[in-house]
Amino acid sequence: MKKILILVLFAIAITSFFYFDLGSQLTLANLKEQQAAFDAQYQAAPFLVIGIFFLVYVAATAASLPGALILTLAAGALFGVIAGTIIVSFASTIGATIAFLSSRYLFRDTIKARFGDRLKAIDEGVEKDGPFYLLTLRLVPIFPFFLINLLMGLTAIKARTFYIVSQIGMLLGTLVYVNAGTQLANIDEVSDIGSPGLLLSFAALGITPWIGKWIVGLIKRRKVYARWTRPKKYDRNMVVIGAGAAGLVSSYIAATVKAKVTLVEASKMGGDCLNYGCVPSKALIKSAKVAEQMRHGDVYGLNKVEPEYSFKAVMQRIHGIIADIAPHDSVERYTDLGVDVVKGYATIVDPWTVEIKREDGETQRLTTRSIVIATGGRPFLPDLPGIDEVGYVTSDTLWEEFAKLDDIPKRMIVLGGGPIGCELSQAFARLGAEVVQVERSDRLLAREDDEVAELALGAQQSSGVEVLTGHDAIRCELVDGEKRLILSADSKEKSIAFDALVVAVGRSARLSGFGLEQLGIETDRTVVTDDYLATLYPNIFAAGDVAGPYQFTHVASHQAWFAAVNALFGQFRKFKADYRVIPWTTFIDPEIARVGLNEQDAKAQGIAYEVTTYQMHELDRAIADSATQGFVKVLTPPGKDKILGVTIVGDHAGELLAEYVLAMKYKLGLNKILGTIHTYPTMAEANKYAAGEWKRAHAPEGLLRWVERYHSWMRR
C-alpha cells in the first residue's frame, strides 16, 4: 500500500509538471528575463529565497523532472559561484539520493524477483567496483543524471556510498555550470556551455578514477615485491606444484604452447582423484551395484541369489583399475608431452624461485616467471576424543588399509552425510557390511532440495544402511577390547560398536609445507585468490581444491586453464575464472546430478522461478530397464524457457545432465532441447520430455481456442 501511495505521489508530481507546463518556466530565455526580479527578491529575503530554491531543486531532482541544468545556472546567477555551488551540490545530491532510495524501495524487489540471476552478477560487480563506476558516471555529465539515480537504486550499492560518491563526483560539474550562470547575460544557448572541448575534458576526467585505481594497484604490487630480488633471467616459464587434475592440466597447457614448464609431485601422479577418490570409489560402487542386482534378480525375471565374493578380490580389482588408468597421468606420458616432471617436495622460496628436494636427496632451485599452486586437499579430521586409540580410515586411506583385509569389516560406521559419505555407506552396505551412517545435521546432502535428500535417505535405507541424522559424534571408546562411538542426540548419549570407522566429513585444502607462510600469501581455508586465480603475488596462481570454492576434479581442470593462461599471457590479456555453469553428481543409486540453481538456492537468492518436473516412471527406457526411480526437475524464470538450473535423479543421471550443461553454457533454452531429436528408446529422452512438460504448461491457450474453432469450421 505504501508503494502504491508513493507511486501515486510521483505520478501527480510528474503529471502536474507537464499539465501546468512548468517546463516552459525553466528555460534559459525566461531565466534571463526574470533575473532582475529574482535578484530583488533575494536581496529582500535571502534566507527565504535560498530555502525555497533549495527545496525546489531537491524536489525536481528527486522526482527526476527536467530543468536541473537551468536551476544550476540560476544558482550561479542568483547566489554567485561559492554559495551557488554549495547550495546546488547539497540539493542535487540529496535529491539524487531520494530518487535512488525511491527506485530501490519501489522497484528493486520486483526487478530482483524477475531478473535475480542477472542482478546478482551486477551486484557482485557493484560490490567490488561500484564506487568507481558511479564516480566515473558523475564526473562525465553527458550521462543522464536522473537515469543514474534510478538505475543505481536497483543495485546493492549502499546509500551512504551513493551519497558521498555522488557529491564528490558532481562537484566539479556543478562548479562549471554554476560559474557559467554568473555570466548569464553572455549565454544565448545552453549548448554554449557544453562545448566539445569541455565535454572531452569531462570524459578525460571520468577515467581518472580508473587511472588512480591502476596506479594504486601498481604501487601495491611493487610494495608486495619490494623485499625480494627479481632474477635477471628465468630457468622456467612456469613451475607447477602438485600433479593432480589442476596441476596436470596446467602443465599440459603450458607445454602445448611451447612454454618451459616443470611439474613437481611429492606423492603419486594423478593426485587424489585417481589414487584415493573418484576412480577407486566408482570401481567400488560398480562392484556393489552388481551385487545388489544379483540379490534382486527377480526384478529382471532371473533367480535372485545372495552374491558370493572375495572382498580381497574386490579391492584387487579397484587397484587394478587404478593401475590401468595411471599411465594416462604418468611421468612418462607428461615427459613425452614436453613437461619436465620432477618427483620431490617443492618449497616456494621467493616469488620467482622454487626449491625442490628430489626423491634421490638432491636439492634443486629453479627460477620461474610464474608459479601455479595445485596442491589439492586432504580429508578433514574432526577433533574427536579417542579416535586415535580406536583407529580409523579416511576416504583417502581406506583403499590401502582395506586391501590388506581378507573380509569386509562386519560393522562399519561412516561419519558424514555428504556425497562421499553417502557413496561409501551404500556401497559397503551392498557388499554385506552392517553400516551406520552418522550425520550431525537434520538430513543428508544438505546442498540438495528436500525431496532429493528424502530420496537419498530412502535409497540408503533400502540398501541396508542405518542412517542417523541429527546425531553428533562426541567421542570414541575402547571397552573390553570393543571399539565404540558415542553419539549425542536430543541431549541423550548413544553407543554404537564398530569394527571400522570411516571418516568422510569433508575435505580441507593443503596449505602448509611449501612456503605460503614465508611469502605472506593469505589463506582462508583455501588460498585467497582474485577473479583471475592470482594470489597476493600477481605471478603466483592457485587452482583446484587448494583454491576452492568447489572441490571437484572437473572444476580443478577447468580452473587450470585460467591459471595457466593468465600466468603465461596475463600481461596481454587476463581471463576471469568462470563458475556460471558448474555440474556435479553424487554417485549413489539412483544417481543425483545437478547444475545451476535448485529451489533452495533460488529462494535464498530471492530469484523468481517456475518448476517443471518429469518423472522417470513415465519414460519407456526407464520402464524397460526397471529403473523408474527419479525425475528431471528444471528451474526457469516465470514464463521463459531459459534454464536456471537442473536436478536429475535416476539411472545415469550424471550422463543425462551433460545436455543441460551444454544448453546453459551456450544459453540454449528448453525450446531448443524440445526441438532436438533424441534416440528412442534412451534415458536421454527424459530431457526432451521435461522440455515438453514446460511447453505444455506454457501453451498459448487463447490461440489454441481460435485454432479449435478453425478446425471445427473446417469439419462443416
What are these regions (language model features)?
Residues 13-53, 89, 93-149, 154-155, ...:
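Membrane-interfacial helix-loop-helix
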Residues 229-246, 408-418:
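Beta1/beta-strand and adjacent pyrophosphate-binding region of the FAD-binding site
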Residues 236-263, 421-430:
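N-terminal Rossmann-like FAD-binding beta1-loop-alpha1 element of flavoenzymes
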Residues 241-243, 255-267, 279, 283-289, ...:
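Flexible, glycine-rich terminal cap/loop adjacent to redox cofactors
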Residues 253-259, 264-408, 441-445, 451-452, ...:
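Glycine-rich flavin
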Residues 388-408, 495-573, 658-663:
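FAD-site-proximal beta/loop scaffold in flavoenzymes
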